[in-house]
Amino acid sequence: MNLEEGSKLLNSDKNFLYDRNESELRPKFLRDFAGQSHIKENLSVFIKASRDRNEALDHVFLSGPPGLGKTTLASIIAVEMNTTIKVTSAPALDKPKDIVGILTTLDDKSILFIDEMHRLKPVIEEMLYIAMEDYKIDWIIGQGPAARTVRMSIPKFTLIGATTKPGKVASPLYARFGIVSRFELYSEDELVKIIQRNSIILNVKFEDKAAWLLAKSSRGTPRVANRLLRRMRDFAQVGGYDLITENIVSDGLEMLKIDHEGLDEQDRNILRSLILKFKGGPVGVETLAISVGETADSLEDFYEPYLILKGLIERTSRGRKATDFAYCHLNLNKNNHNDLGSEQDGYQGILF
């Protein structure tokens, strides 16, 4: 990698050389949370109203692709409500006693955050129905003929549920959430703000053009932007520079095999498979996922939203289909699906 651009040697302060904890990059307050303005504006009203009434915030349902800040926002809500938060995920709630153990130890007006809500077991969902609506839980004491159900009161709490698959959450459970918000992919402007903010936290100097290039390659996702920011810091550090320039980012992305549209090698594998193995589609998501060594869930949750956003693939009633832009991006002839050679010859042109 050519790191000709840059200025001074890195800061010798040992704090620069050791990675900060990931949580330090997460905003602590709603005012610091970049993007998702429609969600923030509504939440600020709901939080203020709940605090003024000295009540628990209504239950909150957060959905959207991974890496957009659902968990971060849950923590921010707890801070803004001046309360505690307990964090778990649906797969960890295996038996009724698991959810009962959590609900009975909550404080009044505290928050329970459950990630991957679409993976809750039916028996856990049924217990949450009563807990969310009446703030009570039914618990069976004893066994056999002597068994009896006892209804216990629990503190008035706020359940924040997050999922990447809102359509798979049971309707009765979904209906009990009073605040429903969907996260959208971030704009480049919003990602630039996140990169600039976090570069200060990581003690990294960034050129404006470098931040824009990094934002453009971050798939509309803060988690990806933060990961790339750390890698650019590594490249600059090893190269002996404390100013990350556009050329450094460009070279770094090329080393990571991320192209000018933000696509990585697996993104291109998906497009190549769709075009070269299935003649551009349409093809079912399960078949396409198997062809690239992914699960259907990971293909739908992580890769597809961005590929659709960039206009590279489209969903049809018969399956996934490559667009004309996908052929152009891979430098493939749409009339010759076996034209793999031209794609390889044009690979460097695809990157930068």
Curated annotation (Swiss-Prot):
SMART domains, alphabetically? AAA
The residues that the entry says bind DNA are 315, 320
Function of the protein: The RuvA-RuvB-RuvC complex processes Holliday junction (HJ) DNA during genetic recombination and DNA repair, while the RuvA-RuvB complex plays an important role in the rescue of blocked DNA replication forks via replication fork reversal (RFR). RuvA specifically binds to HJ cruciform DNA, conferring on it an open structure. The RuvB hexamer acts as an ATP-dependent pump, pulling dsDNA into and through the RuvAB complex. RuvB forms 2 homohexamers on either side of HJ DNA bound by 1 or 2 RuvA tetramers; 4 subunits per hexamer contact DNA at a time.
Q: Where is this region: Large ATPase domain (RuvB-L)?
A: 1-186
Its keywords, alphabetically, are: ATP-binding, Cytoplasm, DNA damage, DNA recombination, DNA repair, DNA-binding, Hydrolase, Nucleotide-binding
* A single BP term in Gene Ontology: DNA repair
HAMAP family assigned to the protein according to its UniProt record, in alphabetical order: DNA_HJ_migration_RuvB
Q: Which reaction does it catalyse?
A: ATP + H2O = ADP + phosphate + H(+)
Coarse class of the primary localization is cytoplasm
- A Pfam family (short name) is AAA_lid_4
Q: Name one GO molecular function term.
A: ATP binding
For this entry, the protein name equals Holliday junction branch migration complex subunit RuvB
In terms of Gene3D superfamilies, this protein maps to: 1.10.8.60, P-loop containing nucleotide triphosphate hydrolases (3.40.50.300), Winged helix-like DNA-binding domain superfamily/Winged helix DNA-binding domain (1.10.10.10)
Taxonomically, which superkingdom?
Bacteria
One of the record's GO cellular component terms: Holliday junction resolvase complex
Which InterPro entries does the annotation name?
AAA+_ATPase (IPR003593), AAA_lid_4 (IPR041445), DNA_helicase_Holl-junc_RuvB (IPR004605), P-loop_NTPase (IPR027417), RuvB-like_N (IPR008824), RuvB_C (IPR008823), WH-like_DNA-bd_sf (IPR036388), WH_DNA-bd_sf (IPR036390)
